[in-house]
Amino acid sequence: MLSRRLIPCLDVRDGRVVKGVKFRDHVDMGDIVELALRYRDHGADELVFYDIGASPRGRSVDYRWVERVARLIDIPFCVAGGIGQVETARAVLHAGADKISINSPALRQPALISALAEAFGVQCVVVGIDSIREADGQWRVRCNTGDPDKTQALPLRTLDWIVEAQRLGAGEIVLNCMDSDGVRCGYDIAQLSQARALCQVPLVASGGAGNMQHFADVFHKADVDGALAASVFHSGAILIPGLKQFLREQQIEVRDV
């Protein structure tokens, strides 16, 4: 069995790391490079950087901080935000990122997934999906979630989009469960389990981590390949070395720190 991945998520706005609750009310958490170095030293398996202002503002990710991070860390990292064309993705990868993630641009232009997979290989292409449960009980996709004033509700069912994104060439899916985001009440096991049944590529859970047991639960019950978290890591409520030891005690395979 492959080792499960622990992935700190760093939401970036105006060159700083921020964190919100249910994608709103963001507060400053610190410098990008300082946090990246801390997580590298603590044994994170990978980092994900979301430039949350890029897509809502119609701009591409700021390559300068990508280059800064790439010069200083030696663990894989993925960059998301405003990557709406192949050349933008090429520039991000050239700046040092290992993978690129697309979310809102893929919803506007699904063929972008295929174009990126053809240009760089599916292993470089992550599709992020922001999902929320609506009144009828269905999970549906949200677009432009980096700015609450520009967030759009789409009729597209989350599970349908997971299937379609894979067909188009996604090499990994990150499912951001918005109802759970930032509230630390646990990952959305029900939604992630249904996604897992449809997902033939690596699936990463996002949204809801509040304690170590939540990580064990999402690996055991939803069988995800990776667990992404932000606030519990940024605040120091959970330290990665201790979390890895806890997971090993739960018979979950993780890489050494």
Curated annotation (Swiss-Prot):
Pfam assignment, any one: His_biosynth
E.C. number: 4.3.2.10
Subcellular location: Cytoplasm
Molecular function terms from GO: imidazoleglycerol-phosphate synthase activity; lyase activity
Catalytic activity reported: 5-[(5-phospho-1-deoxy-D-ribulos-1-ylimino)methylamino]-1-(5-phospho-beta-D-ribosyl)imidazole-4-carboxamide + L-glutamine = D-erythro-1-(imidazol-4-yl)glycerol 3-phosphate + 5-amino-1-(5-phospho-beta-D-ribosyl)imidazole-4-carboxamide + L-glutamate + H(+)
Pathway noted in the entry: Amino-acid biosynthesis; L-histidine biosynthesis; L-histidine from 5-phospho-alpha-D-ribose 1-diphosphate: step 5/9
SUPFAM superfamilies cross-referenced by the UniProt entry: Ribulose-phoshate binding barrel
Superkingdom of the organism of origin: Bacteria
Task performed by this protein: IGPS catalyzes the conversion of PRFAR and glutamine to IGP, AICAR and glutamate. The HisF subunit catalyzes the cyclization activity that produces IGP and AICAR from PRFAR using the ammonia provided by the HisH subunit.
UniProt subunit comment: Heterodimer of HisH and HisF.
Name the record gives this protein: Imidazole glycerol phosphate synthase subunit HisF
Gene source species: Xylella fastidiosa (strain 9a5c)
Gene giving rise to this polypeptide: hisF
